[in-house]
């Protein structure tokens, strides 16, 4: 089954995107190193994967490392890189066994070559899995995403493969990250911060936003269910009127 033809249950999001925020502050409030928070954050991410598999949610996109995170203290960045390599060594096989496809979006060329090799191996190993598509945004920024898409189209115009008047939203969208997936139905951010922080700026134009004060290391199935209950109570309009939504019937929303 092609991913864009998955039937839509209007009370259950197909695709959830999450900013996993609050690891460092969670640790600092407990007088622990920020690295302790990041370790706990990995466990929260795995709990979230478990929840999506249990509920039948087909796509999960996690903001793991932003393009701005390179400006954090060097020891914290180095720890995150080392932890990522260890995670790929232990966790990817388990994700593969459970039918999870792993993808990475972002500027991976900035990472150490060993980490890039782990990313590539993880993608190849899990490429045929369809139970859950897990996209990890690493060294990613929404503005960067749009810039790269615009640059690709500009190169096509310069090469004579494309006319400027042929460029529209659909064509630009085809060059964005996650272009082969439906846009996120629901966006979640933890830690009480109410910002989207340069995450999936293009992709979340009509996404339902949900914020919680819970720090990411404490994020669990109870909080996720609260988010889903809230989502189920909302009416997604996509710019339409109540009458237009009613005439379309349940489940007929843009892919």
UniProtKB/Swiss-Prot annotation:
Name listed for the protein in its UniProt record: Ditrans,polycis-undecaprenyl-diphosphate synthase ((2E,6E)-farnesyl-diphosphate specific)
Matching HAMAP family: ISPT
Free-text comment on the cofactor: Binds 2 magnesium ions per subunit.
Catalyzed reactions: 8 isopentenyl diphosphate + (2E,6E)-farnesyl diphosphate = di-trans,octa-cis-undecaprenyl diphosphate + 8 diphosphate
GO biological process: cell wall organization; peptidoglycan biosynthetic process; polyprenol biosynthetic process; regulation of cell shape
GO molecular-function terms, A-Z: ditrans,polycis-undecaprenyl-diphosphate synthase [(2E,6E)-farnesyl-diphosphate specific] activity; magnesium ion binding
Keyword vocabulary terms for this entry: Cell shape, Cell wall biogenesis/degradation, Magnesium, Metal-binding, Peptidoglycan synthesis, Transferase
Active site: 21, 69
Sites where the protein binds Mg(2+): 21, 208
Top-level taxon in the UniProt lineage: Bacteria
CDD domains named among the record's database cross-references: Cis_IPPS
Residues that, per the record, bind substrate: 22-26, 34, 38, 66-68, 70, 72, 189, 195-197
One GO CC term, this protein: cytosol
Assembly mode: Homodimer.
Database matches in InterPro entries: UPP_synth-like, UPP_synth-like_CS, UPP_synth-like_sf
EC number: 2.5.1.31
Its biological purpose: Catalyzes the sequential condensation of isopentenyl diphosphate (IPP) with (2E,6E)-farnesyl diphosphate (E,E-FPP) to yield (2Z,6Z,10Z,14Z,18Z,22Z,26Z,30Z,34E,38E)-undecaprenyl diphosphate (di-trans,octa-cis-UPP). UPP is the precursor of glycosyl carrier lipid in the biosynthesis of bacterial cell wall polysaccharide components such as peptidoglycan and lipopolysaccharide.
Cofactor(s) named in the record: Mg(2+)
Family to which the UniProt record says this protein belongs: Belongs to the UPP synthase family.
């Amino acid at each position: 089954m092609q991913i864009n033809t998955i039937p839509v249950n209007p009370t259950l999001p197909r695709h959830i995107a999450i900013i996993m925020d609050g690891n460092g502050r969670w640790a600092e409030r407990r007088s622990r190193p920020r690295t302790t928070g990041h370790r706990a954050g990995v466990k929260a991410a795995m709990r979230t994967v478990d929840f999506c598999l249990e509920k039948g949610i087909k796509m999960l996109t996690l903001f793991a490392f932003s393009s701005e995170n390179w400006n954090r203290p060097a020891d914290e960045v180095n720890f995150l890189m080392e932890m990522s390599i260890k995670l790929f060594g232990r966790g990817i096989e388990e994700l593969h066994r459970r039918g999870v496809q792993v993808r990475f979006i972002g500027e991976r060329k900035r990472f150490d070559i060993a980490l890039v090799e782990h990313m590539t191996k993880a993608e190849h190993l899990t490429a045929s899995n369809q139970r859950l598509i897990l996209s990890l945004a690493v060294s990613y920024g929404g503005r960067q995403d749009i810039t790269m898409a615009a640059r690709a189209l500009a190169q096509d115009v310069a090469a004579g493969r494309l006319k400027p008047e042929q460029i529209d939203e659909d064509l630009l969208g085809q060059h964005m990250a996650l272009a082969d997936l439906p846009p996120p139905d629901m966006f979640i951010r933890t830690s009480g911060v109410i910002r989207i922080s340069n995450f999936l700026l293009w992709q979340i134009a009509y996404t339902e936003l949900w914020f919680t004060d819970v720090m990411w290391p404490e994020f669990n199935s109870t909080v996720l269910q609260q988010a889903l209950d809230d989502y189920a109570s909302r009416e997604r309009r996509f710019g339409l009127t109540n009458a237009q939504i009613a005439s379309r019937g349940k489940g007929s929303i843009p892919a």
